[in-house]
A protein has these predicted regions:
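Rieske [2Fe-2S] iron-sulfur-binding domain
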Residues: 2, 7-132, 365-371
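C-terminal catalytic domain of Rieske-type non-heme iron oxygenases
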Residues: 39, 116-371
Length: 371
């Protein structure tokens, strides 16, 4: 169950070079390649001749050529040539709107007539020379909503990431969750605490002492269809915390673009953008390595959680106050999916999707809607 009329990250630009890239997104097999002008093209990964995956072919002079019998496909999904054949009557395949922007390739898997670049959220950190970014990609076998749950409730850091970013004060700081239209924000602030190992490294990277108490913050922003950006940082205690001057803190944005592959697998584009010492390539590499290790710690937990949910779909799950961010984000997703079904006349699902429990028990969820 995914919103389809939305922009999803399909790949990194360097993944689409001289060869076609096959990738399934929202349950739809797609092939990405660059045309003669260097622009990224997305087509259905299906040759109309014999059904072979076009991603197993090659690109010749900006034209996608099927690797089975040499059928050539145009950018709009129409066959343009084939050795010894007339292709005018060949059936077309689907093409998808694509945008290359902010260091990512984005694809619109839904109604192409509704695709609009204006609907792509502006990412200031991706365009400004005052910011540096480093990230990567993981393939994870879990429902994309489990990843959203994980990122909108950072209480798990105390346990899953105990040796990097976790600390007991995260448990002790009550989160505050606010819904504003289709966005959800969960905030948590900690004062006068010790910085965990990752943030000690970040403080040193910004030329700051790492052996003094700090104020720490985590502000998680969910935006449809499945994007989570998290403002994180630490500041020397007593200087204003989140609002501390730049020479007293180390702050960043954790970037999480979650693209469903199937109902139980995702492409997870992760990274961190920072606005201190953006020209320090060694620091960018060090932070990227640290973030990669941190995110890798979630993989086994999420995949084993997915296996349990598939094995026991009738089990009731609790929803506690710490789960409010994920709960509210799921409500946004449910609403958008329902709206799309109403527009297309598609029937409503009569049963939970794979990996989703049939019922949940709600307890202690303070959720506030902004007006």
């Amino acid at each position: 169950m995914f919103p389809r009329n939305a922009w999803y990250v399909a790949c990194m630009p360097d993944e689409v070079a001289d060869k076609p890239l096959g990738r399934q997104i929202c349950g739809e097999p797609m092939v990405f390649y660059r045309n003669a002008e260097g622009a990224v093209v997305a087509l259905e990964d299906f040759c109309p001749h014999r059904g072979a995956p076009l991603s197993l072919g090659f690109v010749r002079d900006g034209t996608l050529v099927c690797g089975y019998h040499g059928l050539e496909m145009g950018c709009q999904g129409k066959a343009t040539g084939m050795p010894g054949q007339r292709v005018n009557g060949f059936p077309s395949i689907r093409s998808y709107p694509v945008i290359e922007r902010y260091g990512f390739v984005w694809v619109w898997p839904g109604d192409a007539s509704q695709a609009d670049a204006v609907k792509l959220h502006h990412l200031e950190w991706a365009e400004s020379s005052e910011w540096a970014y480093g990230g990567g990609l993981y393939h994870i076998r879990c429902d994309y909503r489990l990843m959203i749950d994980n990122l909108m409730d950072l209480t798990h850091e105390t346990y899953v990431h105990a040796n990097s970013i976790g600390q007991k004060e995260i448990d002790e700081a009550a989160p505050k969750t606010v819904a504003e239209g289709d966005t959800v924000r969960t905030s948590r602030f900690m004062e006068n605490v010790d910085a965990p190992p990752f943030w000690k490294m970040a403080l040193r990277g910004n030329g700051l002492a790492d052996d003094v108490p700090v104020d720490r913050w985590q502000i998680c922003h969910f935006t449809p269809p499945s994007h989570v950006l998290i403002e994180v940082g630490v500041a020397h205690a007593g200087h204003g915390g989140y609002h501390a001057p730049a020479d007293k803190k180390a702050s960043s944005i954790v970037v999480d673009f979650i693209t469903p592959e199937t109902e139980t697998s995702i492409w997870y584009f992760w990274g961190m953008a920072r606005n201190f010492r953006p020209d320090d390539a060694a620091l960018t590499a060090s932070i990227r390595e640290g973030q990669g290790k941190i995110f890798s710690e979630d993989l086994e937990m999420l995949e084993r959680q997915q296996q349990n949910l598939l094995r026991w779909p009738e089990r009731n799950l609790l929803k506690l106050n710490i789960d409010a961010g994920g709960v509210m984000s799921r409500r946004v997703i449910d609403r958008l999916v329902a709206q799309e079904r109403a527009q297309t006349g598609a029937p409503r699902a009569g049963a939970p999707r794979a990996g989703a429990p049939r019922a949940e028990v709600t307890r202690d969820i303070p959720v506030r809607t902004a007006t």
